Amino acid sequence: MEHYPFKLHSEFEPQGDQPEAIQKIVNGVNEGKRHQTLLGATGTGKTFTMSNVIKQVGKPTLIIAHNKTLAGQLYSEFKEFFPENRVEYFVSYYDYYQPEAYVPSTDTFIEKDASINDEIDQLRHSATSALFERDDVIVIASVSCIYGLGNPEEYRDLVVSIRAGMEMDRSELLKKLVDVQYTRNDIDFRRGTFRVRGDVVEIFPASREEMCIRVEFFGDEIDRIREVNYLTGEVLRERDHFAIFPASHFVTREEKMKSAIQRIENELEERLAELNAENKLLEAQRLEQRTNYDLEMMREMGFCSGIENYSVHLTLRPMGSTPYTLLDYFGDDWLVMIDESHVTLPQIRGMYNGDRARKQVLVDHGFRLPSALDNRPLKFEEFEEKTKQLVYVSATPGPFELEHTDEMVQQIIRPTGLLDPKIEVRPTENQIDDLLGEIQDRIDRNERVLVTTLTKKMSEDLTIYLKEAGIKVNYLHSEIKTLERIEIIRDLRMGTYDVIVGINLLREGIDIPEVSLVVILDADKEGFLRSQRSLVQTIGRAARNSRGEVIMYGDKITDSMRYALDETERRRTIQEAYNEKHNITPTTINKKIHDVISATVENDETNEQQQTEVPKKMTKKEREKTIANIEKEMKQAAKDLDFEKATELRDMLFELKAEG
């Protein structure tokens, strides 16, 4: 394994309370602290702080986010901060995934159906191979990193290592490639395949995007190794050595495969005896037929559809033991950072039970062997055992972080000097007329307003009332498709609307600098949407504007409201003192309005991108043209590593195709 230091590229130096936060976390890691929490207010540069910690600590780092969009955003940011180091992306490679399931009440079996994103699969392979090649690796992952993966030792041991000048004939290399699940394809050359032309073998590694390896033989010796652009054939550079990692994470040696097949046959025999004893003849016949088909595929091809369900046998683990995951691909000394930990940790905790419930039904009705239950995500206790040092990052840490952290590392100061918003609590009497007056004030100043309610009916009624009063308003709710949701937020920023009304305005993408007023109706109704954390997060929506204010309507002050008021006031006091001491004037964040709604097409004459609005109703020809344009832009966004935009464009495609 090669050693490289982390090199952070940024035109900014840590400022405000960032230097102190960085030093505290670095000291904690060096002292061997297991749990640390960075309590960072919205907009204080938590990602930059995390980057500085990684640079100073110098350990391979896993950063876990709670969804693909957030992971993609972090990936783009860390790639910018560490262009000379290996920043990798590891999320579920399914664009669409329907797990196999059985509904006993209707006797319905749902086959597994999935669409695999080839680029994300390549990035997953890039991540695992990087962890074995270097120690300056940052992996940005979603919660899918706790799902089962192949044995890392087997994955590493089966690497095909080639050197210029080494003795190896062509047929020996081809056999080794087939053993690690590469397939020969002389026509359709793509990732995970190789092609043969005389004494030249070209291999397309599973972890690469555009580069393939050309191996030239002279008799029984490798004469030269070169990196080549697979499309143009251009030679990129000479290589003395190259390591070809397996094309699948579930790769198994031939002798192990034989042992695994024997174990599966033994388990099948035992399970059939159980089912027959219970007079479950249909289930027994179904299980025997399905399992024998899979076994035949394994003998002939070395793999089968759904091979992950036999992972406990393929890795020769005892039944019920902890599965291998991405966490096992890290060495002994590494760091975990959990972003938005108040959301991510509960997700990690809940994965096992949901997966278990679905698979148990499949096992009970003869669709799978009991060992399929061992192809699962980690239990939370197993996750804790596998991780040694964790840094939780959140503006509102949850109970787990509070319980396990001695002292919070706080980051309250914003580099822009922005303060937490002023909060005012007002009675509910005449609240709508009062709200109307406040909205009108903001419209006069060309500012925007967010209003959060507790119920769908309240949102709808309020939206109708405001429209009748002449306000440009729209309503955000869970039934609105991704395409429309992004369009509504963009239209708010552009001034098409002045107000957005919604129930839960905490989702990503609602940080809008133009918003100077956040209104919380029914603030005194305790519950999930009016809890301490929800209120603090909602208040944060007004923290991107120098005139940010929050109005809570309620007839009493609940414990959650009191906490949110006190916490915001505490932060404001710290921020004001810092600004006064350093003579800083708060300035509203200037955030570019990205065009994620329009498909862009390339103008041949000007070679510039122009916007093409997606019409509400389109002819079939127009729809096909729009779909082609969006697909083109989506692929370009993925190529530019702008996964957030690529994901949004993908969702637009799904919706346009569904409407067609």
UniProtKB/Swiss-Prot annotation:
Domain Helicase C-terminal: 431-593
Region (Disordered) location: 603-622
Record-annotated UVR domain positions: 624-659
Any one Gene Ontology molecular-function term assigned to this protein's record: ATP binding
Stretches assigned to the Helicase ATP-binding domain: 27-414
InterPro entries in the record: Helicase/UvrB_N, Helicase_ATP-bd, Helicase_C-like, P-loop_NTPase, UVR_dom, UVR_dom_sf, UvrB, UvrB_inter
Disulfide pairings: none
Keywords of the record: ATP-binding, Cytoplasm, DNA damage, DNA excision, DNA repair, Excision nuclease, Nucleotide-binding, SOS response
Binding site for ATP: 40-47
Residue positions of motif Beta-hairpin: 93-116
NCBIfam families found in the cross-reference section: PRK05298.1 (NF003673), uvrb (TIGR00631)
Family the UniProt entry places it in: Belongs to the UvrB family.
Domain-related comment: The beta-hairpin motif is involved in DNA binding.
Primary role: The UvrABC repair system catalyzes the recognition and processing of DNA lesions. A damage recognition complex composed of 2 UvrA and 2 UvrB subunits scans DNA for abnormalities. Upon binding of the UvrA(2)B(2) complex to a putative damaged site, the DNA wraps around one UvrB monomer. DNA wrap is dependent on ATP binding by UvrB and probably causes local melting of the DNA helix, facilitating insertion of UvrB beta-hairpin between the DNA strands. Then UvrB probes one DNA strand for the presence of a lesion.
Protein name: UvrABC system protein B
